[in-house]
Amino acid sequence: MNNKPWITIMLTSKCNNYCSHCYINYDGEWDVSEVVECINDLKGTYNINLDGAEILTKPEYLSLFPLVDQHHLMTNGKAIYENPSLIDLLKQNGITDVSISYHYGIHDEVSSFRSSCVEQTIELLLSSNFNVTVMTMLNKKNFLLIPDICDFFVSFGIKKVMFANYICQGKNKDRNSILDKNEVNCALNSIHSMRQKYESSDFYVSRTGAFGFDSMHGCNLCCDAGTEGFVILPNRKVCPCVFLCENNFFIGEYAKGCDFLSCSTFAHDFYSCFALENLNYCTDK
C-alpha cells in the first residue's frame, strides 16, 4: 500500500435495516456522476474508500468500485438476502471481500434484520466464494462472549472476525451500553487470547481502533482522523472520522481541488482513538 492519505466517501445515509446502535449521523446521498467527478479529482492525491449506511440500497454505486480499485464491501446483508442476484453484480464489479454485520449475543435485540437471516446470507456468500468478514459490535451485554463468538464463527466456516467497540454516536445514545476502561481491557485481553488460540491463516481475529491503544499487549494503533484520514459526507462536509460526523468536528467542505491536509487544523493524540475519548469517555456528553 502507498503512503497517500485516505479519503472515505460516504455515498448515502439510506439503509434498509433498523439498528438501535446505528452510528450514522448525517443525511443525504450522492449521485453516481458526482462521485465519479470527485474520484477523478482526488484519486491522484488520496487513496479512496467507498462506504455508506447501506450501499446496496442503490446498486448503481457498485459501478464506482472499479474506479478506485476497491474489492471489499460492507453491508448488513439484507439486500443480498432479499435479492440473491446481487451476488452476480458484486462479482461483475470486482468485489471479492464482503464484511457483514452480525452482533452475536445481542443481534436480534439491536437489529431488525434477524440473525437467522444473516446466517443464511453468510452461507450464500461463502458458497459463492467470497471472503467473508463478520463485523461484531461489543457492548456491556456481549463483551464477555468473545470466546463463544469466535468458536461459533469458526464452526460456521468464517475466516475473519472484526470486533467493533460501541461508540456513543448517531442512534447510539444509551450511555449504559458503553464499555468502561476496565471492560475495554477485558475485551482486549479476550481478543489477545483468541489470537493465541487460532492460527491467523485459519481464523483471523481483528478489531477496530475504537477500543483505543492496547498498552497490555502492544499494538500499532495510530489514529489518523483529520490528519491522514478524512470523510466526505453527501452534503460535502468533511469530517475526520465516520464517528465524528457532527458540527463541532467538521473540518470544512469539499470543493474541487481542495487540499484537506493543508486546511485541516484537527489535532489530537495519535496513540488514542479521538472518537472513543470524546464520545464515550468525555464527561461533558
Question: What is each residue range found by the language model?
Answer:
Residues 7-9, 48-50, 71-75, 98-100, ...:
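Hydrophobic faces of well-ordered beta-strands that scaffold small-molecule active sites
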Residues 15, 19-22, 223, 241, ...:
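Short cysteine clusters
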Residues 92-97, 157-160:
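Glycine-enriched alpha-helix->loop->beta-strand junction motifs that scaffold or abut catalytic
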Residues 1-93:
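Conserved alpha-helical substructure of the radical SAM core
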Residues 30, 103-225, 234, 238-239:
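Radical SAM enzyme [4Fe-4S]-AdoMet core and its adjacent flexible, acidic
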Residues 235-285:
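Flexible mid-to-C-terminal extensions adjoining Fe-S/redox cofactors in radical SAM and related proteins
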Residues 6, 226-227:
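Short coil/loop residues immediately preceding or within conserved phosphate-binding loops
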